[in-house]
Each structure stands twice: as C-alpha cells, then as structure tokens.
C-alpha cells in the first residue's frame, strides 16, 4: 500500500460508476461504507453534470458490522428499484465494502427483481478505474446483447442492396476527456460517409439499446481502454469487425476514414477531399523557430499519448523526448510507440517519478493530465492537458473535440497557446531592462504627476551567487551556474538557448567543472564548434 496525495486512477468501482452515469435507465447499487460516497462529487462538481449519478450506496457504518450487512444491502437494492424503476441494475462492492465479503451479486439475483441484475465483481486491490470501466461495459454487453447472439458457426448475413451501413460507436463514458464532443464529431463524420450510427454506448445508451448492438455491421472503437474487451467479444460472437485507428490528428483521421469506408463498403474520396482541418497549414505558416524542435514530454492514458506523440512529431514539428502512461494494461502500446521516437517509455502511476523525469529532460512543453499541469507550473514549463484525469476547466461549455478534423484544429490551438511566440520573447528580452518599460514605470498616459505602483521587482531582491538548474537538482555531482553565466546565457537566442545550456552542462561535467562561469560557457561553445 502506498500513501499519496494524488492518484491518476480511482478504484475500479469508480470506473463502473462512469459507465452507469453515462448510460440512461441503468442503476448501480454499491455496497459501500459512508466514506465511499465521495464519488458523487466527481460527476456533479468536476464534470458539472446537472444530476447526481444513478448510484445507491448502502452506506453501512461501523455499528452495522456487528449486525446483518447482507440484509442492509438487500434493502438498499429493493428501495433503489422501487424508487428509480430502471431497465436494468448492476450491483457490486467498493474497495472497502469488498472486505466484508457479502456477495452482492448473489444477494441481488436471489431477490427475484423483474429487471436484469448484472453482478460486477471488481478486484479492488489489484485493478483500477479504467479496467473497472472496461469490465463493467463488457459484462453489460455480454448480459444484454448475448441472448440475441446467432447460433455458433453461423455466418453473418449480407447487407441488403440499397440499405445504408450501420455501426456502433463504443467507448465514451461519463467523466471522460472530451468524450461528449468526440461523439458528436465522429457521428457527423460517419454521416458524411453515408454510415448510420446504430448505438452509441455506454454514453447515452439504455439497457434496451445494448440488446441491439448485434444489428450493426461493424463497431467503431474510440477509446480502447474502455471498449476493446467488449468489441472483441462482439467480433467473436456477432462477427462484427471493429476499427483499430483512433481518429486523433489529421493523418490518423484520414486513416480512420479509409478504414471505416473499407469496412462499410463506401467511397471515402469525397470526405477526404473535403478535409476541413487547418492544423497542417497553420503548423507550416507560423514562425518555424516557434514550433520546430521544441522538446515535448507526453504523459496520460495510452490512447491519447500515442496519438499526441504522432501529432507532435509528424504534424507540428516538435521533438518528442519522452512519453509515458499510468495505465499498465496498455504498457505494450507505449513501449512500441517509444521505439518510434527513440525514447525510454515511462510507465508509472507515481506522480513524483513523473515530475523528476520532466525536470531531468529539460522540456519546453508538457502534454499530460491535470497533475502534469501542476508539475509544469512548479517547474515553470508550458503545459497543455491531453488526457484524463482532468479538472473543471477541461470540461468546457464550448464545443471542443479531440477527434476528427475539428479536433485537430482544437489540438493545435490548445498546444500552441501556452508557448511563448518568438517575437514575443525577443521583445521581452529587448525591453525588460528599459527604464520606460520596467514594472515600476509610470504609465505614459497618466503624466508625471502620478506615482508608479509599488511593485516588488526581481532586481530589488538579493541575487544568489549561483543558480541551480533542474538537471543540477537531479544529480548531486552536476555543475551549477554562476549568476553572471546565467545572465550571459540569456543573451543567446531562445531557440538555441536550451541546446547551449545542455552542451555547456555536458562540457562542465566531462571536465570536472563544479561552477559554470562565463569562461566555461565560451569554452564549451568552442569545444562543440570544432
């Protein structure tokens, strides 16, 4: 067990709640103590939903442990059914509730309720949130779509001539990163291809909708962390193929369109020709030193990290210096992606390890989760959020997908805005010491009679004799920078300053220099210019 102030994923029953909350007509009865009801806040405060999640807690207390907690659970199930009248119910235990081993599934099924009751048995101390969501969705699909499965060995009937192809969209849940807008974007894209959407699940689907999953010709998997297990089962039982390409970025969206068109037997050319993304042109039209070669570190769930690395490297021109994920179930995908960029993958759920890695790499942009936003703020590095878990500001009121051509536009704006433009940095460097433009200067339109606001400037504070860089903090033997050397370094143009810093530190370490001075800086320049 590890004590921490942050976790990338909650326990698996939170994943089950994400599925239940995203659906309609489904109710989740959770055998849990009073303290486990915090999960309501995730949906009402963080995602800002206008209703509570469809979850009933038994909320047993310490005094109940000496009595019949099984009867307490059965009462909660009966009351939940009578109050909400759902089409189906799922039952399970929280991580704490599983310790008393009351068997919620067996208890609920023995009650004879007139609706399907699906037991969700989640190993709370071995698995986490995304796995719990995937397992819950799989059990729902298997229980509700299974009865309409064709006989084993039978072939899937051909689609009648003139009938539009149909697909299911699988994977979006509550509390997902831009899932709501991604579904809208991909549904519109499929419509342009002449493909109808049979069911979108879990988000927006009812238990009755899940019984119709087998009617589709194929499945579109948007989030493999949630839907890959269910899609594999549908492929095996209903002979429905499913997509492998995640349409995040211009190139991936084009490949997705071609893949979907091949599965549906439609012509992709008109939609490919009508590419509405501005990312490609914008990334070529801005100042090349503003984007090209920026050192970027990417961390999050595997789906978004792999897609982001491709966009960063191939479509924007960043240099990917590190990628990682907190999801060990998808470690293989991250390791394969890391080989493409010749970097060492970071697979961990320890945010302190992630922070140390970011500091060591001396990156210029971080793409990650809410925690990487906090880390970047501490390190003074620009950051953009690309993956759950996220905070309130990443559930915007506006339309902001990540998928499709419009998603590529959103991604470009989101990633580029935190960066300082080349002209902006040059102007700040040129005028930061000017007597008219410093912080304490009187605004020119106020005249000489007004006093300047009292501002504590950095120059008025005593300066340390040496400034320690992130790399120096990372290792005890690394050289430190003298103040005059730091000042001289800032005279170097920003787009090569990072390289100059790294080369100088490397030169100092190789030659046993403890403190980097101005002379060391120029000696290193001469050394690497040979």
Curated annotation (Swiss-Prot):
[4Fe-4S] cluster binds at residue 36. The keyword ATP-binding applies. Disulfide bonds: none annotated. Residues 454-463 have a biased composition (Polar residues). Keywords: 4Fe-4S, ATP-binding, Bacteriochlorophyll biosynthesis, Chlorophyll biosynthesis, Iron, Iron-sulfur, Metal-binding, Nucleotide-binding, Oxidoreductase, Photosynthesis. Substrate binds at residues 422-423. Its EC number is 1.3.7.7. Belongs to the ChlB/BchB/BchZ family. This is Light-independent protochlorophyllide reductase subunit B. It comes from Rhodopseudomonas palustris (strain BisB18). The gene is bchB.
């Amino acid at each position: 067990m590890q004590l921490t102030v942050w976790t990338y994923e909650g326990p698996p029953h939170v994943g089950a709640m994400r599925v239940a909350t995203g659906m309609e007509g489904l109710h989740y009865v959770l055998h849990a103590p009073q303290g486990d009801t915090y999960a309501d806040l995730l949906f009402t405060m963080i995602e800002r939903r206008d209703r509570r999640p469809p979850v009933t807690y038994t909320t047993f207390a310490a005094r109940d442990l000496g009595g019949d907690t099984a009867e307490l659970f059965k009462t909660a199930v009966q009351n939940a059914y009578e109050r909400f009248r759902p089409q189906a119910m799922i039952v399970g235990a929280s991580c704490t509730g599983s310790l008393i081993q009351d068997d919620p599934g067996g208890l609920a099924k023995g009650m004879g309720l007139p609706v399907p009751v699906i037991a969700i048995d989640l190993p709370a101390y071995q698995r986490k949130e995304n796995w719990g969501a995937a397992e819950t969705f799989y059990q729902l699909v298997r229980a509700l779509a299974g009865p309409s499965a064709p006989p084993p060995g039978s072939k899937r009937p051909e689609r009648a001539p003139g009938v539009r192809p149909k697909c299911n969209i699988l994977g979006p849940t509550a509390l997902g990163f831009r899932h709501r807008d991604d579904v809208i974007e991909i549904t519109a894209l499929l419509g342009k291809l002449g493909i109808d959407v049979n069911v979108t699940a879990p988000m927006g689907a009812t238990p009755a909708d899940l019984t119709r999953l087998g009617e589709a010709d194929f499945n579109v998997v948007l989030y493999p962390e949630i839907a890959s297990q269910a899609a594999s089962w549908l492929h095996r039982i209903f002979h429905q193929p499913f997509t492998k390409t995640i349409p995040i970025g211009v190139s991936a969206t084009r490949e997705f369109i071609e893949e979907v068109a091949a599965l549906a037997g439609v012509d992709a050319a008109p939609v490919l020709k009508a590419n509405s993304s501005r990312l490609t042109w914008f990334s070529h039209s801005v100042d090349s030193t503003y984007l090209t070669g920026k050192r970027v570190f990417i961390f999050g769930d595997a789906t978004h990290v792999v897609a982001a690395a491709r966009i960063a490297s191939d479509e924007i021109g960043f240099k990917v210096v590190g990628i990682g994920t907190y999801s060990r179930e998808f470690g293989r995908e991250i390791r394969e992606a890391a080989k493409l960029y010749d970097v060492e993958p970071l697979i961990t759920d320890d945010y302190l390890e992630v922070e140390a890695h970011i500091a060591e790499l001396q990156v210029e942009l971080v793409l990650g989760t809410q925690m990487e936003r906090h880390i970047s703020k501490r390190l003074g590095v620009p950051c953009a959020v690309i993956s759950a878990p996220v905070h309130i500001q990443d559930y915007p009121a506006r339309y902001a997908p990540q998928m499709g051509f419009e998603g590529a536009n959103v991604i470009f704006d989101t990633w580029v805005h935190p960066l300082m433009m080349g002209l902006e940095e040059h102007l700040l460097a040129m005028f930061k010491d000017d007597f008219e433009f410093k912080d304490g200067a009187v605004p020119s339109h106020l005249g000489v009679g007004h006093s300047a606001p009292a501002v504590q400037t950095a120059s008025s504070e005593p300066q340390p004799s040496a400034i320690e860089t992130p790399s120096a903090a990372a290792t005890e033997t690394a050289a430190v920078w003298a103040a005059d050397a730091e000042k001289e370094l800032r005279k170097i143009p920003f787009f090569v300053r990072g390289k100059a810093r790294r080369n100088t530190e490397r030169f100092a370490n190789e030659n046993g220099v403890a403190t980097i001075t101005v002379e060391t800086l120029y000696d290193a320049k001469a050394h690497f210019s040979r």
